[in-house]
Amino acid sequence: MEWIVFGVASFLATYLLMPPFIRLMEKHKLLDSSGGRKIHTGYTAHMGGVVIFVASLVSVLLGIFIMDYADLTWKALAFITLMSLVLLVGVRDDMNNLTPKIKLICEIAVGFLLCYIGVRIHSFYGLFGIDVIPVWLSYILSIAFMVVVSNAYNLIDGIDGQAGTQALSFFCFMFAIFMFVFKDTNTLSVEDNFANTSFWLLVAVAMIGSLLGFLVFNWQPAKIFMGDTGSLFIGFLLAICMLVMMDYNGENTKTICSLEIKSNLLVVIMLFFLPLADTLRVFIYRVQRGKSPFSADKTHIHHLFFRIGYKHSKIALTTLSIQVVISLISIAMAFVLEDIFYIIYIIGMWFVFVFGLRAFTRSRIRKLRIKK
């Protein structure tokens, strides 16, 4: 019951803070203009990620104070401080457009500090026959993972409602998993872990509430965008939560309905499948055409759906539905498939996604041409 209170608190904080924040952005002309690859028209306030962060932080701190977590260590406070730094990098980028190089350096630096406080993958838990990995390799893989996930999330923030709904899907699944699977697991075997189930439940429910509040103002026609401020902060938080869940899941000894999870690490990645799969698809597409994988174009999934006549709200709901269905299927498959077969399943799902998307959009384009 208490989790509902904290979720409602973050929702109300976002809902109440957003209107004055929008007016502040409009007053100081901190607006996102249309043109280029952008689908929206006119000028729209951005940096909505600031309100999402503040609202979720208020909820988390409220939870810590009310529930009096004696086992909440300095790591949680260090984590909040580092997430504040990520937010500031995003604000700076929204206001002055940081160069990709500077932005990457900032991401790596924050990633390193997060690894230092224990937010990293410590073991492969039997994947490829590997268990505990060297610290230096753990740092490299974890930082790379944070950079990839945060940038993949940033790349899907192209239409009203899509980035918010994708993050909402992940945090809902995360909350359910921590609540029903990891609730009584507050210690892990690795020494420098970040094992505090109650803290991560607070993070998940706070983000669910603040994202719902944000979507009220970000739904088509959007009154505000989350901006790089939001996409960088939320993208990093998604990566962090995935790394934490990998450690919890790797050491999980519980069964659900007498069934044991056989693929511990890879199932976590599938909760964020669509952004990662679409980013890989677009990068390969660009390379095949002799372009840099980082060059800008209009080939992301939301661009394709927009091309066949879908409105922002329909695109957001369609991509959300795809992600939810894939998450449910992937969780079910984790009870059936060992790691090696789960890898084959992931590769197969990517091909189904790529060729299914291509066939669907081409079919709709042909129908539109016939009508004309």
Which residues does each predicted region cover?
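Alpha-helical transmembrane segments
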Residues: M1-K29, F53-L88, A163-K372
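Membrane-interfacial loop-to-helix junctions in multi-pass transporters
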Residues: V132-S142, S198-L202, S263
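Membrane-interface helix caps and helix-loop-helix hairpins in membrane proteins
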Residues: Y69-A70, V91-L98, F128, N154-D160, ...
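Short acidic, Gly/Ser-rich segments with clustered Asp/Glu that frequently serve as metal-coordination loops
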Residues: N96, V148-F170, S231-L232
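A generic, lipid-embedded transmembrane alpha helix
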Residues: A45-F65, F112-I117
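Juxtamembrane helix-capping/reentrant segments at transmembrane boundaries
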Residues: S33-H46
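Membrane-embedded alpha-helical core segments of multi-pass
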Residues: T81-V89, C106-I121, L141-N151, A167-F173, ...
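Membrane interface segments of multi-pass transport proteins and intramembrane proteases
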Residues: D94, F124-I133, Y310
